[in-house]
Amino acid sequence: MRVDGRTNDELRPVHIEPNYLKHPEGSVLISIGDTKVICTASIEDKVPPFMRGGGKGWITAEYAMIPRATEQRNIREASKGKLSGRTMEIQRLIGRALRSVVDLQKLGEKTIWIDCDVIQADGGTRTASITGAFVAMTLALGKMVEEKKLPALPITDFLAATSVGIDGEHGIILDLNYIEDSKAQVDMNIVMTGSGRFVEIQGTGEEATFSYEQLLDLLTVAEKGIHELIARQKEALGSLAEQIMQHCSEGEEAK
């Protein structure tokens, strides 16, 4: 048994609360175990200067942690006057991941701003941010369709992320909490679509190596977890999830 009593391939309890805030076009509070992230999606009728006139939209993300999201208070990065390398890496990861499942041409010259604010951290904050941000973005785009600002959802597939790792005591484990992450011999973050295609694989040996066979096993366990996360996304999205599934089916038939 793991530190919190889970089996090796078991996610922590997942809860996605849609429309968590009243002002953003899309928002959720996602809780994965004791990790909690507020994700919002805001839409602007303009794109960055480098994209003007191209007819395509853009998706960008910001990520932050409140000072007491962790056991010891952290100084706000705004107070330091610059973002850490970790924060910049995570922001880029969230933006890249979401752009992979949106038809930016159909979005038109609009920018979707994703804001992910970690209010409690216990491992897996970047993967929780991606999983929650997808739901917030879908809610925002659904509102645009409802208001007839878009003819249809420009989303091509579902998207979620999780972590996997190798623990010296338990072997391959899914969805690492902070204690497990700090002790893992191998740590990996996986982003996948609903159709099982990889968007990002970030894997590191922590003073250890891992074999090709272990890599395949890690990916298999991650895929299981991501399918379960997408099932939770579908529950939170309701009829919007059905629209995405219909779009995916039409895309398969067109191939």
From Swiss-Prot:
Transmembrane segments: none
Keywords: Nucleotidyltransferase, RNA-binding, rRNA processing, Transferase, tRNA processing, tRNA-binding
Signal peptide positions (record): none
Any GO MF annotation of the entry: 3'-5'-RNA exonuclease activity
InterPro entries in alphabetical order: ExoRNase_PH_dom1, ExoRNase_PH_dom2, ExoRNase_PH_dom2_sf, PNPase/RNase_PH_dom_sf, Ribosomal_Su5_D2-typ_SF, RNase_PH, RNase_PH_bac-type, RNase_PH_CS
Binding site for phosphate: R86, G124, T125, R126
Keyword ATP-binding among record annotations: no
Top-level taxon in the UniProt lineage: Bacteria
Assembly behavior: Homohexameric ring arranged as a trimer of dimers.
Name assigned to this protein: Ribonuclease PH
Organism: Anoxybacillus flavithermus (strain DSM 21510 / WK1)
Gene: rph
